[in-house]
From Swiss-Prot:
One GO CC term, this protein: chloroplast
Organism: Bumilleriopsis filiformis
Domain 2Fe-2S ferredoxin-type: 3-95
Major localization class: plastid
Keyword annotations: 2Fe-2S, Chloroplast, Electron transport, Iron, Iron-sulfur, Metal-binding, Plastid, Transport
Pfam families xref list: Fer2
InterPro entries cross-referenced by the UniProt entry: 2Fe-2S_ferredoxin-like_sf, 2Fe-2S_ferredoxin-type, 2Fe2S_fd_BS, Beta-grasp_dom_sf, Fd_pln
Alphabetical GO biological process terms: electron transport chain
Binding site for [2Fe-2S] cluster: 41, 46, 49, 79
Record protein name field: Ferredoxin
Compartment(s): Plastid, Chloroplast
GO MF: 2 iron, 2 sulfur cluster binding; electron transfer activity; metal ion binding
Cofactor(s) in the UniProt record: [2Fe-2S] cluster
Amino acid sequence: ETYSVTLVNEEKNINAVIKCPDDQFILDAAEEQGIELPYSCRAGACSTCAGKVLSGTIDQSEQSFLDDDQMGAGFLLTCVAYPTSDCKVQTHAEDDLY
C-alpha cells in the first residue's frame, strides 16, 4: 500500500507531500521525489536523519539508535522508517533529540 507522507520544516522551508509505499523507507522516497533530507549512515545507527512524527504511524523496527523514551516522544529515523498510515513528519529534528 502507498501512503501520503507530509514532510515539514519551517526553518528549511520544507512543506511537501510525498508518496511512500509501505515497503520503502521515507528517506529514500523523499530523495526519489527531489527532497533533500539529512542522512549519514543510512542504517538506523545514528541520529543525522532524525525526524519527529506529528501525526500518523510508522514502523522503524530496524533502527538501533533511538531509545524507548525518544521513540515514545515521536522521534524517528527516516532512513529506516516505513509509513504504516498517512503521516506527517517534521524533518531535521536531530538537535531536538538532546
